[in-house]
């Protein structure tokens, strides 16, 4: 289990590094830059040059990339060119939903995966084991978006157990908010739980 978690952490770090490089390179090759976005395509060259210097866009690309990464590590995500406010403020405004959703999905992942993996390992090659492995294989194979749509169709549209209208807000009540996060959390949790359950089973059988 520790090897799996360490591998997941290293994979996450590598993915973040690669994603940051790809995003930076895409922004580099796109026509125009933030200065032109702010001032418009008809802005005077001297005005553009002054704004580029103010924003640090006149520095070499490698310097700008490392300044961007170091700023993020210190919590400085820069200024949103669209909203004209620090990006960190926009993140804080939305983390009130994203963070609880992530925690909820993680909790469901562990609650589902650990018992499933333990039961499958303890009943190796039985019908129970084969059933659990079959379900987890389905959980790995089915795309998340299709699974999420199916959950909404069954539990919100057909059975009316949940709302399909989005997150109601924490001001409507804690449990109503949790109810609004349940379907998205399940959609996020089941694919990860399927992977973790299979890893758990293999790890237990190897010991």
Please describe what each predicted stretch is.
Residues 1, 57, 61, 65, ...:
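Juxtamembrane loop-helix boundary motifs flanking transmembrane segments in multi-pass membrane proteins
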Residues 2-4, 13-16, 92-129, 144, ...:
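Alpha-helical transmembrane segments of integral membrane proteins
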Residues 3, 40, 50-53, 67-71, ...:
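Short amphipathic alpha-helical coupling elements at transmembrane boundaries
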Residues 15-66, 159-180:
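Hydrophobic alpha-helical transmembrane segments of membrane transport/permease proteins
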Residues 22-29, 59, 67-70, 134-165, ...:
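Membrane-water interface segments at the C-terminal ends of transmembrane alpha-helices
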Residues 23, 27, 31, 35, ...:
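Membrane-water interface at transmembrane helix exits
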Residues 58-114:
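An internal, D/E-rich "acidic patch" concept
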């Amino acid at each position: 289990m520790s090897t799996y978690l360490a591998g997941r952490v290293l994979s996450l770090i590598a993915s973040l590094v690669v994603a940051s490089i790809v995003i930076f390179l895409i922004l580099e090759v796109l026509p125009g830059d933030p200065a032109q976005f702010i001032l418009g395509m008809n802005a005077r060259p001297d005005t553009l040059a002054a704004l580029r210097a103010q924003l640090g866009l006149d520095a070499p690309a490698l310097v700008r990339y490392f300044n961007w990464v170091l700023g993020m590590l210190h919590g400085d995500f820069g200024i949103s060119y669209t909203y004209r406010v620090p990006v960190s403020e926009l993140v804080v405004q939305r983390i009130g939903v994203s963070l609880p959703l992530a925690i909820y999905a993680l909790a469901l992942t562990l609650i589902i995966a650990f018992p499933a993996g333990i039961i499958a390992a303890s009943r190796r090659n039985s019908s129970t084991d084969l059933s659990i492995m079959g379900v987890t294989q389905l959980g790995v194979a089915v795309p998340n978006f299709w699974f999420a749509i199916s959950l909404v169709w069954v539990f919100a549209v057909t059975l009316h157990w949940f709302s399909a209208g989005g997150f109601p807000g924490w001001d409507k009540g804690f449990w109503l908010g949790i109810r609004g996060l349940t379907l998205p959390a399940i959609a996020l949790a089941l694919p990860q739980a399927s992977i973790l359950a299979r890893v758990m089973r293999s790890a237990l059988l190897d010991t």
